[in-house]
Amino acid sequence: MHVLDGSSGGGQLVRTALTCAAVSGESFRMRYVRRARSNPGLQAQHCAAVNAVADICDAATDGVEVGSEAFSFEPEVAAEEADDDEEPTLGGTTSVEVGTAGSIPLVFDSLLPLAGALDEPITATLTGGTDAKWAPPMDYFQHVKLPLLREHGIDATVSVDRRGFYPRGGGEATLTVEPSTPTPITLTERGDREALTAYSVAESSLADDEVAEQQATAAAPDAAHEIAYTDADSAGSAVVLAAEYEHSRAGFAALGERGVSADAVGENAADALAAFESGPGAVDSHLADQLVPVVAVAGGEVRAPEVTTHIETCVDLLAEFDYDIDIEHTDDGAVVLSA
């Protein structure tokens, strides 16, 4: 069993460990989970990720509860303990409540890298936050990350049944991942921008003030606009700029907050897009972080705007499972990740 140190990382480290264990069949125990965070230990969305992946690979777990700073994960043990004649399989159906506004897209992130190792499809239905703080909104997941992964052989789709905004959540979405043959993810050049779409969503009570329209216009007045109003348990809003380039994709998001105007929310997304396009990355920094475990199992080369703590800690953890990723710093400040 691998003994992993979770003190220097956050939820991304937990999700990466789950990916490695499910694909390799190797067990781990993680100690000092998120110790450097202001709220150390597992939080609700991390527990949801552990439980979802455990369902998919018949894992036995211990210590999976909110606040726990140590937990273990043993793939295929639950199937073996069932004492039947069926071989353990990777895939199946899971339904997990993330809790309040815990991020549904971040839990989905723990399942996507499994695509190339699946014996049968994954169908994962989660309830919680679709558009939550400190996480990519659902439109980023749906219109930036998934299209990029599909271009590289990962057959995954998501349906959103209900939006969930901070703080109450209450959203619901279902991810389907088919057994796939991923191709190496080679994203070293950005090229010219070929398309830009502003996806702007707000809870129905904000329609009279045209919050979604204002966000989209402030973010990108000349882009295509996809405007949506939706019933939800909490009032909230989000805007995502989905940019398509000659050789890559990137996304830039901002969430509505009490006391922040819709125009300011849109401008935050616009500023992030402008900063990215003035820099050297082929993908945005959030996508680069999330692609690390996918590159580890599928191979490839990704040019990120910068090396983040998420990248460094995940690369170190991947090495524990014999997945080697090289980090090359370039003269223009970018970093190239290759496997």
UniProtKB/Swiss-Prot annotation:
One of its GO terms (molecular function) is RNA-3'-phosphate cyclase activity. Catalyzes the conversion of 3'-phosphate to a 2',3'-cyclic phosphodiester at the end of RNA. The mechanism of action of the enzyme occurs in 3 steps: (A) adenylation of the enzyme by ATP; (B) transfer of adenylate to an RNA-N3'P to produce RNA-N3'PP5'A; (C) and attack of the adjacent 2'-hydroxyl on the 3'-phosphorus in the diester linkage to produce the cyclic end product. The biological role of this enzyme is unknown but it is likely to function in some aspects of cellular RNA processing. Belongs to the RNA 3'-terminal cyclase family. Type 1 subfamily. SUPFAM superfamilies: EPT/RTPC-like (SSF55205), RNA 3'-terminal phosphate cyclase, RPTC, insert domain (SSF52913). It catalyses: a 3'-end 3'-phospho-ribonucleotide-RNA + ATP = a 3'-end 2',3'-cyclophospho-ribonucleotide-RNA + AMP + diphosphate. Its EC number is 6.5.1.4. This is RNA 3'-terminal phosphate cyclase. GO terms for biological process: RNA processing. The active site is at H310 (tele-amp-histidine intermediate). InterPro entries: RNA3'-term_phos_cycl_insert (IPR013791), RNA3'_phos_cyclase_dom (IPR023797), RNA3'_phos_cyclase_dom_sf (IPR037136), RNA3'_term_phos_cyc (IPR000228), RNA3'_term_phos_cyc_type_1 (IPR017770), RNA3'P_cycl/enolpyr_Trfase_a/b (IPR013792), RPTC_insert (IPR036553). It holds the Pfam family RTC_insert. ATP binds at D109, H286, L287, A288, D289, Q290. It is found in: Cytoplasm. The gene is rtcA. Keywords: ATP-binding, Cytoplasm, Ligase, Nucleotide-binding. One of its GO terms (cellular component) is cytoplasm. HAMAP family: RTC.
